[in-house]
Amino acid sequence: MYDISGWKHVFKLDPNKELSDEHLEMICESGTDAVIVGGSDGVTIDNVLHMLVSIRRYAVPCVLEVSDVEAITPGFDFYYIPSVLNSRKVEWVTGVHHEALKEFGDIMDWDEIFMEGYCVLNPEAKVAQLTEAKCDLTEDDVIAYARLADKLLHLPIFYLEYSGTYGDVELVKNVKAELKQAKLYYGGGISNAEQAKEMAQYADTVVVGNIIYDDIKSALKTVKAVKGE
């Protein structure tokens, strides 16, 4: 079993986007700590299974971030369950999770499942629009969500999601200072090694996603930048 607490860098792959076998091999053999499979729209059991089978040719740990109950399948090392703490819709905070537990609760391996407390901060992002996230937050608001995840809900992961735009480094630093047990994940807008290294100063885990599809070479350079190898 892998220890997610030591992961510094992960790639996130969208099953609804095209990725060549060559580029997938580069990602999986890059030295990243894990590959997360997940997306906001167009996620189906078929494209999730296709991605799973492709990644399983390699030794890298593989995580399914669950956004649709219908796309859950066995075979991943871990399952991340996002709860969008700043969503205006209860279904994205606990509703979908309740449905999943009704359907799969009896067969879940709880050692493989981790809840993520998301705070979505880019109003233009698909995930913000889908979940109706309240993104016009002050730093105090964000820190309060971090405390909620860390101290009240005791979630293992607090995820600052800027999805498509580069975030506020000072805010990431201040959020990290508040967390006692939750690991801080940062995702959003990382387009080069310098940005990845900057966020890695404060985030426990840096998530690199969109740049994979735009500039694979820059994406690969983020691994060493984050892990200092």
From Swiss-Prot:
Keyword Zinc listed: no
Residues the entry annotates as binding Mg(2+): 14, 40
The protein's annotated pathway: Membrane lipid metabolism; glycerophospholipid metabolism
Keyword line: Lipid biosynthesis, Lipid metabolism, Magnesium, Metal-binding, Phospholipid biosynthesis, Phospholipid metabolism, Transferase
Domain of life of the native organism: Bacteria
EC numbers, comma separated: 2.5.1.n9
Catalytic reactions of this protein: sn-glycerol 1-phosphate + all-trans-heptaprenyl diphosphate = 3-heptaprenyl-sn-glycero-1-phosphate + diphosphate
Keyword Lipid biosynthesis on entry: yes
InterPro entries: GGGP/HepGP_synthase_I, GGGP/HepGP_synthase_sf, GGGP_HepGP_synthase
CDD domains registered for this protein in UniProt: PcrB_like
Residues binding sn-glycerol 1-phosphate: 12, 159-164, 189, 209-210
Single GO MF descriptor: heptaprenylglyceryl phosphate synthase activity
GO biological process entries: glycerophospholipid biosynthetic process
UniProt cofactor(s): Mg(2+)
Quaternary structure (record): Homodimer.
Role summary: Prenyltransferase that catalyzes in vivo the transfer of the heptaprenyl moiety of heptaprenyl pyrophosphate (HepPP; 35 carbon atoms) to the C3 hydroxyl of sn-glycerol-1-phosphate (G1P), producing heptaprenylglyceryl phosphate (HepGP). This reaction is an ether-bond-formation step in the biosynthesis of archaea-type G1P-based membrane lipids found in Bacillales.
Family named by the database record: Belongs to the GGGP/HepGP synthase family. Group I subfamily.
PANTHER family named in the record: HEPTAPRENYLGLYCERYL PHOSPHATE SYNTHASE (PTHR40029:SF2), PTHR40029
Protein known as: Heptaprenylglyceryl phosphate synthase
Protein source organism: Bacillus cereus (strain ATCC 14579 / DSM 31 / CCUG 7414 / JCM 2152 / NBRC 15305 / NCIMB 9373 / NCTC 2599 / NRRL B-3711)
